[in-house]
UniProtKB/Swiss-Prot annotation:
Keywords on record: ATP-binding, Cell cycle, Cell division, Cell inner membrane, Cell membrane, Membrane, Nucleotide-binding, Septation
A Pfam family recorded for this sequence: CbiA
Example of a GO cellular component annotation carried by this entry: cytosol
Protein name as it appears in the record: Septum site-determining protein MinD
Organism: Neisseria meningitidis serogroup B (strain ATCC BAA-335 / MC58)
Record GO biological process: division septum assembly
Keyword field contains Cell inner membrane: yes
Family: Belongs to the ParA family. MinD subfamily.
InterPro entries, sorted: CobQ/CobB/MinD/ParA_Nub-bd_dom (IPR002586), MinD (IPR010223), MinD_FleN (IPR025501), P-loop_NTPase (IPR027417), ParA/MinD_ATPase (IPR050625)
Function: ATPase required for the correct placement of the division site. Cell division inhibitors MinC and MinD act in concert to form an inhibitor capable of blocking formation of the polar Z ring septums. Rapidly oscillates between the poles of the cell to destabilize FtsZ filaments that have formed before they mature into polar Z rings.
Subunit structure: Interacts with MinC and FtsZ.
Length: 271
């Protein structure tokens, strides 16, 4: 059976889709057959970040409503042999996303015929239908937050939903929760403009999976249709690679928590 991981948050604009793209890509680069599903019906951004928007013919709702097969709707990634994208619909009503339909998709992806090992669910923000469907079947959840009070507070609400409205919760179990902090700037934390990692951990009380530093490279990668994890010697890329390692049970020291110390020459010449 495939492991189902939902990337979620209480607030929009925290980098969920960027994170979903890089985590799915990172797992595929490690050799795992991975599907990443866009649950944001009506908006659809995952295909843009993955650089496959011109190859979308069918979408998740087409599959759920029997208008296309999974094989017809899945888009093979141009960079990773083991990675496939299932886009959301831009035109359908969100109510078309049914629990029975999503369950059928998950079962087919997990089955022997398709043989996916990981399914990454890119959830819309908040508690709308797409978000509830994305998290319902999750084995694990990556709760994504910016180091801002409103973002962290809204993430706390999502934790409550995971603990009460997921399939695992209904069965008396629990979804394994991870905390991912995005757009983190130690310099801004030092100035009191952002919450610190410790502040966020103290509020949410879930294990820290990783810290993604604030970086223009993330925006540039998204605009070019390539997940930032593909970039070499870029802090955000290295941070996502660390996240993949920790998801797979490997020990990695937390990085990017402190401000980068400038060399003597950079300080001297203002670089």
């Amino acid at each position: 059976m495939a492991k189902i991981i939902v990337v979620t948050s209480g607030k929009g604009g925290v980098g969920k889709t960027t994170t979903s793209a890089s985590i799915a890509t990172g797992l595929a680069l490690r050799g795992y057959k991975t599907a990443v599903i866009d649950f944001d019906v009506g908006l659809r951004n995952l295909d843009l970040i993955m650089g496959c928007e011109r190859r979308v013919v069918y979408d998740l709702i087409n599959v759920i409503q029997g208008e296309a097969t999974l094989n017809q709707a899945l888009i093979k990634d141009k960079n990773c042999e083991n990675l496939f994208i299932l886009p959301a619909s831009q035109t359908r009503d969100k109510d078309a996303l049914t629990r029975e339909g999503v369950e059928k998709v998950m079962q087919e992806l997990s089955g022997k015929k398709m043989g996916f090992e990981y399914i990454i669910c890119d959830s819309p923000a908040g508690i709308e239908q797409g978000a509830l469907m994305a998290l319902y079947f999750a084995d694990e959840a990556i709760v994504t937050t910016n180091p801002e009070v409103s973002s962290v507070r809204d993430s706390d609400r999502i934790l409550g939903i995971l603990q009460s409205k997921s399939h695992k919760a209904e069965q008396g179990g629990s979804v394994k929760e991870h905390l991912l902090i995005t757009r983190y700037s130690p310099e801004r934390v030092a100035k009191g403009e952002m919450l610190s990692v410790q502040d966020i951990c103290d509020i949410l009380h879930i294990p820290l999976l990783g810290v993604i530093p604030e970086s223009q490279n993330v925006l540039q990668a998204s605009n070019s249709g390539e997940p930032v994890i593909h970039q070499d010697s870029v802090a955000a890329s290295e941070a996502y690679k660390d996240v993949i390692a920790r998801l797979l049970g490997e020990n990695r020291e937390m990085r990017f928590l402190e401000a980068e110390k400038k060399s003597f020459f950079k300080r001297l010449f203002g670089g």
